[in-house]
Amino acid sequence: MRAKGCVLACWNMMIPYLCPELPEAQKEALHYLVKVPLVYTSVGIRNWTSFQKLGIQRVSSPGSYWSAVSLNSPVNMGEYRSPTSPEEPILLHLSRSPCKPGLPAREQHKIGRYELLTTTFETFERKIRDQLARTLSAGGFDPARDIEAITVNRWPHGYGYEYNPLFDPDWPEDQRPNVIGRKPFGKITIANTDSAATAYTDAAIDQAYRAVNELLPG
């Protein structure tokens, strides 16, 4: 394949391997941003009467294994309709970002990733059943009776890294690793959320627009 230009729109940490000719300072900058490990879990339950009895929709649990438990947000598409009666089955959404408190954020993410990759499904299931029982039992929830299915989605390289003033230097704008890392190299430009040091769609669109324009003449 031949082209007049190329946009590398992948994870920052992969780019030095795809283009080893980059300057060392740029490769170092591309390796700086460490993605946040995440676990998003869906739990199918027979009904959500326990939530109704307790008068809750979401529970935040700082310090617990799962940091948040909530009823899935209602989505109506085509002929599909979200459950409206507490007697109907529904999905719960559980989230976790494994970390190691006390360390710099980037090191916490690395340790959290290792934990995530070495955790068995049996451990996730046990933690789910235990926390849901402690959270919802006062509303009549019984994990042995009410849990129908569990799906664990592990993202070892989850959200893009965002600078944290507790751990990262207060760089001038042009010296931030994401800015150094996205510099054009010949006919190669770089676009991804890492280039904006964030994790969201609007940033990806903005960075794609910038990278394409860097390739255009004039």
Predicted ranges, named:
Residues 1-62:
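Glycine-rich loop(s) and the adjacent beta-strand/alpha-helix scaffold that form part
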Residues 9, 44, 50-218:
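Conserved flavin/dinucleotide-binding core of flavoenzymes
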